[in-house]
Amino acid sequence: TQIGGCLQCFSRYGAKFETGMHFIGSAAEGQTLRKLMKYLEIDNEITLSQLDPHGYDVVALQGKQYKFANGKDAFIQQMTEYFPHQHDNLVRYYELVEEIANASSLHSLKYAESDTSINTEYQLRSINEVIGEIISDSTLAKVLVGNLPLYAAELDKTPFSTHAFIMDFYNQSAFRIQGGSDTVATALAHTIQRYGGDVLARKKVTKIVCDDTRAVAVEVNDKVMIPCDYVISDAHPIRTLELLDTKLIRPVFRKRINQIPQTVGGFTVYLHFKDNTVPYLNYNYYGYQEDTPWNCEKYTEETWPKGFLYMHFCPKGEAKYASTGVILSYMQMKDVEKWKGTSVGRRGKDYEEFKRLKAEKLLAVLEQHFPGIRNNICKYYTSTPLTYLNYTGTEGGSMYGNAKDIHMGAACRVPQRTRIPNVY
């Protein structure tokens, strides 16, 4: 059917929704993602719409809203207006974020300037520890992690380097993709085809076939064999290893990969608005019900949802009003575990009622932040960690796959090269 994994979109009653990649960063001229788009020859097929540079992310905490502005000077100036006594600390914070990002050859595309020592240090120190050392205002320290749903950070676990990469990536510039993220998948397919490649849909890889030393083919749909020189898998590492029934992968490696913790799953409500009722939001909104963005993944039936991320879909052309939007909150796989093993659309009335109740609860919270929004929604649709598991194969229905934990160090890392020389 469709290609592109989480780049895919879906439509219901004429309304279009994105499933995964809702906005991108560092896509202005000369920036990292723009360079990659040009290299992949997709830049001319994709139309970007820049989010508000004065507040591309808005964090709502304890009844106040805080805007993240694009660019170092603008970001520091904006935050200093909220926290005048923290200016010097904000400069120190931002310079550290830049230093870590620039020291990554992958993040900066500047291999000669890579510096692994600083990244090694901040891969072993938690976000809250480092920010707590630099920022003396506890509220500002919380605001700076207000966008942590973008990477499902956990208190005392997620390394500061992860935070630095995300902050730098989006703070350089932030854009939505006009017409939907599936245009990226289509553009990538066009590039592959221009160079003589084929893009195959409805072809599920069921096995990576190896001889005594290397991969020689992939089996598709349990029957068709496609010979290969190289295999590059973008599936979850656990799913990839399941395809490799070979002694070339050591049992101890399989065990380590299977034991890596996963990021939390998500519950998503896709919103179809009534025509010309909801003004288009040119920013992302992070709302919190308690006094901190931390620990939203630790909830009870009564306290859920502790936080949410709310965004609008960017239609083609200039739009004054939004047609669709999305609201996302954390959800643990255990909440839907009893329906595991059922198929999409056939999970039963109990599952549908579970989703309806969760959606209404999440919409009630959204109404607190945007009064009147509930009456402007004509239809909505939902997804759970089970949906992620079924459509993407991500372990435990996690939003971002493997989690990073400073206490596990290298045990959390997955090498891009396997012991099979032509499998990545």
Describe the residue ranges of each PLM region.
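C-terminal segments that line or cap access tunnels to active or ligand-binding sites in enzymes
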Residues: 274-386
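A short, glycine/Asx- and small/polar-enriched loop/turn
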Residues: 62-63, 153-158, 209-216, 321-323
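N-terminal glycine-rich phosphate/pyrophosphate-binding loop and immediately adjacent elements
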Residues: 1-96
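Mid-domain catalytic core of redox enzymes
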Residues: 176, 206-320
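A glycine-rich dinucleotide-binding beta-alpha-beta segment and adjacent secondary-structure elements
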Residues: 139-155, 368-424
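Rossmann-like flavin
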Residues: 61-158
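Helical element adjacent to the flavin cofactor pocket in flavoenzyme catalytic cores
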Residues: 164-219
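General small-molecule cofactor/ligand-binding pocket signal
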Residues: 47-49, 198-200, 378
